[in-house]
Amino acid sequence: MKPTKKHISDKALNQFNENGVVNVRLQHIADAAFVSVGHLAYHFKNKDGIIDALYDELKTKQEILLTEFRIVPLFEDVNRYLKSIYQLHSAYIFFYLDTLEILRAYPTIQTRHSQHLRWQLMQIKTMLDFNISRGAFIFLTYQQRLQLAWQIRSMVEMWRYMVRIENSENETEENFLYCIWGILKPFFSDMG
């Protein structure tokens, strides 16, 4: 059996994913976890504490994926990384659908997330640098690499949100991969 704090955060994650952050109260989380609000408050002072803990989990998992990915970012590693990111985004979908609301309501998360996005951008740029140096991509200037890294990172971070806004039925891993590789494909060299 899971420790109570982890059980509560897992149930909160399910509630946020299903209903959105703004629509979930502590009572909903307590009911889902089969604990009293008082018992929940023993582990998490308030909803802010739960969201903060979930963001830390998400960020840590993303950093692990990016750290593993940057060791040798060959195309099969890039694809494996993208599949893992898709799965991670699925598990924490509330964050990607409610990003702006969360960042407005939780300034400390906004600060940490901004730092994380900058780090993520540099990791993607490093992947581009590596693949350009091995001849898999055409030559790009520093500014072009940064812009391409920004486009990839933006698509990765916002893809779910856009698919939901469009009310599309294409919210699949296959379509996610197709969109990201579609950004990269024009930059493949003959070798790539």
Language-model segments: residues:
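Short, basic, alpha-helical segments at the C-terminal edge of helix-turn-helix-like DNA-binding modules
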Residues: 56-62
